Each structure stands twice: as C-alpha cells, then as structure tokens.
C-alpha cells in the first residue's frame, strides 16, 4: 500500500470512543488479566447494545476536528513508534494524599467559562461531573509562548493536553502544514490517557497563552474520584435490605450501572403520571413522596439516605402514581435506568412485589382507600 493511500485511512470515531471507555474502565478496575477483562467487558457491552441510543452515537461525531489533528496517529507511524499506552501505574486505593494537595492555578470567571466551552465536547471531559470538572480546571496551568516556540513535536512522548487562550498555532505532519489554530482550539487530549508518540507538530506563529493539563494529574482526579464513587455505591447498596438477595458480583455490576444525579431543595425528581424510566437510591439528603388528592398534594412519606424509590412503577409497568421532591437542601441520588433495572435486579423482583402490599396499606391509612393505586412511587 502506498504512503498516500495509507494516509487516507481514518480511525472511526465510534472505535475511538469504545477504546477510550474500555481504557478508563480498565484503569479503574485494575484487573489482573487484561485479556480476560477485555472479553468480559466487551461481552457485557454487546449485551447492552439495544439500550444504546442513536443520540449518543451522533454526539460522538461532534468532537472537534481540530482537536484530533495533533493526536490522530497516522498508520505509517503505528508499527514503529507506538509505546506502552499505560506507562505510569496509579493505584487509587493506595493514594491517601489529601485532594487539597493538588495545585490550584487561579483563573478568572471568564477564563474558566472559556475552558468549559472549549472542552465540553471532548470525550474524556463529557463524562466528568461538576466537582471533577472544577478540579480539572483548577489544575490546568498557564504556559506562555513566543513566536517560533514548539508546543509539541511529532514523535515525542505525549504528556500534556492544551487549550488555547490566545495566539496563532500551526500544525504539521511530516513537515507538511495541515491546519492552523487562530486564538481558539485544543490539542493533545489523548495524552491524558495514553503514553504514545505525538502524531503531529504544533508550533506557535505568534505570542500567545495556553492552558495545560498533565496526564498524571488528570488520571489522579478522574480515577480517584471514580474509585471513591464506586466504593461509596457499594457501601450504599450493601445497606439496602432488598439487595441482600443479590450476590456480591451482582451488587458490583449494579454499582457500575448507577448514575449520579443531584437536585436542589424543592425540585421535583419524578412526576405523578409520568412514564417510569428508572429507580433511585438516596446517597444524601431526604425526599418527600406526595400524591394528588382533591386538587392538592398530600405527603405520603419521607425517605432518607440508604432508601430507594421509583422501583414499583417498573415492577407494575404503570405510570408514576406519586411525585417525589427533594427536601431539606441538595439531594444526591444514584439513578438506575429501566434497562439496567430489568437486567440486574431480577433476583429482587419478588421482594419488590411484596412491597406493593405495604404501600397499599399506607394509602388506606392516609386516604381511607387505595384509590386503585398499586404503585405509590
């Protein structure tokens, strides 16, 4: 194959995302055998394919074309220059350092807003929660450049990711000019995960300012946060009596499927009459369960940390029969969508069905009848 034809080969965005997500999962789990873990990971991924929406796939196509130029490794380099992609080991369980030890580099509100806007469509940043994003933004450091400065050189090991604050920068591959950044853009994001040679050279055409993030800091923030969250989820799930019917590995799979959500005081979480899309476990705070009665909402119960709601609509396949509101400050919840619910909570189904009788008895005490409601959630 000629060099011209090889340069036309493009790595599909879907493949990039799958490999990146697998890499993150591998780093978090740190299994003893990468092959066995890969088989298990991709088998599970294949079983979940029907639940993947076209919307998620189309979002991947929105990744900035400019941001890929400096990291999209040409095939001609792959066989001779690729190095170990996980050169630095990091064990989040062994990291006892205080999060406050991470350096914080001051930025104006305007600069932070521009950074958020710049990175919001980068795959690695799309999955960050607000707290993680703030930690990443705090840790990004300033680099001033002068005309002629080389920011990255083709073939060098990748270490930093860059967001352009100001300046003009030219991108070269094999000394051929392929792109120009004009006071905006980003490059080098794959360096946050992979220890691989740079696939392009970026040189400053004018003086300018860059914000940079190094791989070790990013991975520490991301992986330590992910590790802590999983541990927290495991502790939360271990405290739920209903889930005692699950095996340990089933609870671990359940923890991996949970998605964090937060609601402010008074904010509605689910609405009576809506279709059920999942259930919730309460991480922090309290919620109020209310039902419409005579043109007014009547509180049925309050739930707190370690309790759950929303499951009975999934069991009965009926619309939500009550509304749930956050009360007493910010409420943090772990959300399990309906597909994962059906896949993971089969062993608990009998327990949840028995709970229906308890809720109906509660309705009789409050309203004098069940009002034909078989699901108060």
Curated annotation (Swiss-Prot):
Residues 48-69 have a biased composition (Polar residues). GO terms for biological process: adenylate cyclase-activating G protein-coupled receptor signaling pathway; axon guidance; behavioral response to cocaine; behavioral response to ethanol; cellular response to ethanol; circadian rhythm; locomotor rhythm; olfactory behavior. 3',5'-cyclic AMP 1 binds at residues 124-239. 3',5'-cyclic AMP 2 binds at residues 242-362. Residues 48-78 are annotated as: Disordered. Its main location: cytoplasm. The pseudophosphorylation site binds to the substrate-binding region of the catalytic chain but is not phosphorylated. The physiological significance of phosphorylations by other kinases is unclear. The modification Phosphoserine is found at residues 51, 58, 64, 67, 84. Keywords: Biological rhythms, cAMP, cAMP-binding, Cell membrane, Cytoplasm, Membrane, Nucleotide-binding, Phosphoprotein, Repeat. It comes from the Eukaryota. Regulatory subunit of the cAMP-dependent protein kinases involved in cAMP signaling in cells. Mediates membrane association by binding to anchoring proteins, such as Akap200. Might play an essential role in the regulation of neuronal activity in the brain. Belongs to the cAMP-dependent kinase regulatory chain family. PANTHER family: CAMP-DEPENDENT PROTEIN KINASE REGULATORY CHAIN, CAMP-DEPENDENT PROTEIN KINASE TYPE I REGULATORY SUBUNIT-RELATED. This is cAMP-dependent protein kinase type II regulatory subunit. It comes from Drosophila melanogaster.
């Amino acid at each position: 194959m000629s060099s011209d034809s090889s340069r036309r080969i493009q790595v599909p965005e879907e493949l990039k995302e799958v490999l990146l997500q697998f890499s993150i999962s591998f780093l978090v789990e740190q299994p003893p055998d990468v092959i066995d873990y890969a088989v298990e990971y991709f088998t599970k991924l294949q079983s979940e394919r029907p639940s993947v929406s076209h919307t998620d796939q189309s979002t991947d196509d929105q990744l900035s074309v400019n941001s890929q130029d400096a990291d999209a490794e040409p095939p001609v380099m792959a066989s001779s220059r690729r190095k170990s992609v996980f050169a630095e080991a990091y064990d989040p369980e062994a990291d006892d350092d205080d999060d406050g030890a991470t350096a914080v580099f001051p930025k104006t509100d305007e600069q932070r807003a521009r950074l958020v806007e710049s990175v919001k469509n980068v795959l690695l940043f799309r999955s960050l929660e607000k707290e993680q994003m703030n930690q990443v933004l705090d840790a990004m450091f300033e680099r001033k450049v002068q005309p002629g400065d080389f920011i990255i050189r083709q073939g060098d090991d990748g270490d930093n990711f860059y967001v352009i604050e100001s300046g003009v920068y030219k991108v070269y591959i094999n000394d051929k000019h392929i792109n120009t950044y004009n006071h905006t853009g980003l490059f080098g994001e794959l360096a946050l995960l992979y220890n691989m040679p740079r696939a392009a050279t970026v040189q400053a055409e004018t003086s300018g300012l860059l914000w940079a993030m190094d791989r070790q800091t990013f991975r520490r923030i991301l992986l330590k946060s992910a590790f802590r969250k999983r541990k927290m989820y495991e502790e939360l799930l271990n405290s739920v009596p209903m889930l005692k019917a699950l095996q340990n590995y089933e609870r671990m799979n359940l923890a991996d499927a949970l998605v964090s959500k937060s609601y402010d005081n008074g904010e509605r979480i689910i609405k009576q009459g809506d279709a059920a899309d999942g259930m919730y476990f309460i991480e922090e705070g309290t919620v109020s369960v209310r039902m419409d009665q005579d043109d007014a909402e009547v509180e049925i119960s309050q739930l707190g940390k370690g309790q759950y709601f929303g499951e009975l609509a999934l069991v009965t396949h009926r619309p939500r029969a009550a509304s749930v509101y956050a009360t007493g400050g910010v409420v943090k919840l772990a959300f399990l969508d309906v597909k994962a619910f059906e896949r993971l909570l089969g062993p608990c189904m009998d327990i949840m069905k028995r709970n229906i009788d308890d809720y109906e008895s509660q309705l009789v005490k409050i309203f004098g009848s069940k009002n034909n409601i078989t699901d108060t959630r």
